[in-house]
């Protein structure tokens, strides 16, 4: 019988000394054992280096390697550096303040191996947890938020409600085997955070081409948009990880007021526009390669969808990304620090 392929993991860290050990340990506990794992510290000024070295020494796991950067590269740069250490057809990126549940890799890899259609990206739902690993919400409301029933009055199935151990307080959720194939990107849709995703490595190598200084954050939004445009995506309808909201996140705040709440600590629309325009530029600049790989029709549809979302690109010139940024967003993406390639895009 055929064997499952190995999976690569990059844990990119910046200033998360309080949580990075839990992230590393969650990868070590994965039921799939054929892993290559790289922990990248993105020049953290806190005690992250000490925490990472202590954790790796305690584990004594030969699958783990450690790279400490002397200069902060941001999220894209740190992830690229980590990927240079990997030789796997699939890759995942775990934010160092989040944690995976034990079957995260197994569930994603099984869905990627489906006998229906191969995609570049699978992503899953998440629990929202606090700094002490306590669950604040049983789902990320934005996960697959374009589904028709998202805003409908409805009965919530008992299978979506956990049992609570009265002695320990431990929550147990029933297993949810549901998966959904999304054949095309939609501006109304959403996936989930970086830690929810498993990518085909060849796809990441193909499209993660913007210079690192232009993509210091929001690599998840960039890659998931590209995956939806070029290959389609598959959603796994079970929370397979804990997305931690602790008050010091690069993007999110620490509150869950309920409803379709805004989890960001800054305005989303300028960020969304910036990243989509970056996708649009790469569709143009890498057109020959993308057409050869995915076909003329798929590329043309992607260009049209981006034009509908953010407008047409200027004809005959490529304006520098920073020149189009409002001052607030320039500060965020130009100087922001990562939580968290074969080509040198620094």
Predicted regions, residues:
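Membrane-interface aromatic/basic loop that binds lipid-linked glycans or pyrophosphate carriers
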Residues: 1, 284-346
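Nucleotide-sugar donor-binding/catalytic module of glycosyltransferases
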Residues: 1-258
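Short secondary-structure transition/capping segments
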Residues: 82-85, 140-143, 164-178, 263-267, ...
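General helical structural elements
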Residues: 83-84, 204-205, 248, 276, ...
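Short flexible/disordered coil segments
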Residues: 98, 129-130, 184-199, 254-255, ...
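Catalytic core of nucleotide-sugar-dependent glycosyltransferases
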Residues: 241-247, 252-291
């Amino acid at each position: 019988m055929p064997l499952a392929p190995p999976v690569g993991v990059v844990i990119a860290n910046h200033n998360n000394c309080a949580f990075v050990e839990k992230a590393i340990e969650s990868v070590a506990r994965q039921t799939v054992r054929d892993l290559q794992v790289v922990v990248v510290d993105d020049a953290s000024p806190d005690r992250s280096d000490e925490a990472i070295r202590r954790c790796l020494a305690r584990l004594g796991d030969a699958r783990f390697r450690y790279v400490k950067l002397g200069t902060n590269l941001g999220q894209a740069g740190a992830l690229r550096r980590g990927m240079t250490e990997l030789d796997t057809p699939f890759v995942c990126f775990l934010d160092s303040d989040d944690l995976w549940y034990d079957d995260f890799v197994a569930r994603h890899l099984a869905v990627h191996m489906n006998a229906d259609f191969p995609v570049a990206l699978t992503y899953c739902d998440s629990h929202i947890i606090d700094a002490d690993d306590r669950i604040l919400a049983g789902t990320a409301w934005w996960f697959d938020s374009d589904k028709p029933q998202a805003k409908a009055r409805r009965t919530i199935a008992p299978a979506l409600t956990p049992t609570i151990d009265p002695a320990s307080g431990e929550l147990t959720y029933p297993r949810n085997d549901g998966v959904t194939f999304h054949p095309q990107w939609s501006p109304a849709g959403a996936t989930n955070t970086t830690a929810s995703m498993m990518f085909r490595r060849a796809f990441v190598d193909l499209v993660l081409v913007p210079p690192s200084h232009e993509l210091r954050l929001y690599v998840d939004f960039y890659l998931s948009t590209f995956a939806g445009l070029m290959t389609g995506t598959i959603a796994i309808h079970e929370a397979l990880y804990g997305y931690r909201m602790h008050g010091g996140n690069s993007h999110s705040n620490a509150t869950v007021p309920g409803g379709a709440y805004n989890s960001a600590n800054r305005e989303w629309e300028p960020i969304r526009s910036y990243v989509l325009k970056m996708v649009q530029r790469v569709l143009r600049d890498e057109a020959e390669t993308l057409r050869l790989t995915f076909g003329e029709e798929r590329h043309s549809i992607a260009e049209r969808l981006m034009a509908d979302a953010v407008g047409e690109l200027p004809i005959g010139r490529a304006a520098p990304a920073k020149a189009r940024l409002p001052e607030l967003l320039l500060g965020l993406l130009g100087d922001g620090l990562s939580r968290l390639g074969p080509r040198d895009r620094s």
